[in-house]
Amino acid sequence: MRYCKKCTMPDTRPGITFDSEGVCSACRHYENRKNVDWDARFKEFEAYCNKYRGMNGPGGYDCAVAVSGGKDSHFQVWMLKEVMHMNPILFSVEDNFPMTQAGIHNLKNISEEFGCTIISCKPNIRAQKVLMRKFFEKYGKPTWYVDRLIYTFPLHMAAKFNTPMLCYGENVSFEYGGCSDKETYSAMDQIENGVAVGFPMEELVGDGVTENDLSLTLAPSAEERAKLDPFYMSYFVPWNSYKNYQIAKEHGFH
């Protein structure tokens, strides 16, 4: 087994690569941040926001954010609502597990603090129970059903609400090492990053689970996805989880 000589990331991380000096791609990407013109990137972000600003008329939502209620979600919503003066709608996926008091507070807080509507998907509990057991026993991935919805639900909702500008936090493959080594603003291919890949429907149905129960796990059609313009916030601003936490804390995050 190989480990990155800088951060000790092992080669068991899917898609991770090492250069001739034994340093992982994530560390090299971080080092290259100093060469990025972040002022120019922010101007790109302003132009990107202006492209969609007010697109659905007065009072209409002009962008969307996939949120969990965590520190990064707070940062993303703060950036779009308070800094860029957009009007975001938020999409969230529950997991049907008991939530901590902090978790309950944080998801409520992100709506109350920034004055945003959250549309939350509470997955089909019967299907989740069946699929958790099946995917644990067969693939070692008990949470696949919920993980998949986290990727697909915001896309479906962005299409329904006509909010092509769908915000995600960081490009996990680029920031931490993974399937894609390309730095891009576009999150269009995020659904293919290997975290929650799709499975053939015949693998999923059975034991009381039908295709009707699984419609949201399917990605939107190619035609619908072509109308969307999802993006990574980490492309436009230097991504820093601790600074995100500090901003979130200032706005009521527990």
What residues fall within each predicted segment?
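Nucleotide-activated chemistry modules centered on ATP-dependent adenylation/adenylyltransferase
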Residues: M1-C63, M79-H254
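Hydrophobic positions on the alpha1 helix immediately C-terminal to the Walker A/P-loop
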Residues: F75-Q76
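Short, glycine-rich nucleotide/cofactor-binding loops
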Residues: C63-D72
